[in-house]
A protein has these predicted regions:
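Charge-rich, low-complexity N-terminal segments
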Residues: 1-110
């Protein structure tokens, strides 16, 4: 099994739509760290699990310096973002989304 990991640093803002009163319902920003883990039994014809540049272009290209509420079709919680990122990247099996020090959400395909 081959494993690769891509770490992305993204600046972006969001506002959460919550069923309770929270300061997170106000527009605010984070310096996000999104870690994408991919795996494959075989390598593609170029000798890779997936191209790191493709991950960066697909994820950072859309999210970096964006208001996530404007570009994502769901409530942009860290958990929802983790799942969305995993769905966007070929051979992805896990994503960790850190919105601030100590606050990390993960999505993993078992």
């Amino acid at each position: 099994m081959y494993y690769v990991t891509k770490r992305l640093e993204i600046s972006g803002s969001h506002r959460l739509e919550l069923s309770y009163k929270s300061k997170c319902s106000n527009l605010h920003g984070h310096n996000w760290i999104i870690t994408v883990h991919c795996k494959s039994d075989t390598l593609n014809p170029d000798g890779m699990v997936t191209d790191f540049t493709h991950i960066k272009e697909k994820i950072s290209g859309l999210l970096d310096h964006a208001n996530f509420n404007d570009v994502l079709p769901f409530n942009p919680t860290a958990e929802n973002i983790a799942r969305w990122v995993c769905d966007q990247v070929e051979n992805c099996w896990r994503v960790d989304v850190q919105e601030s020090e100590g606050n990390i959400a993960s999505y993993q395909i078992d």
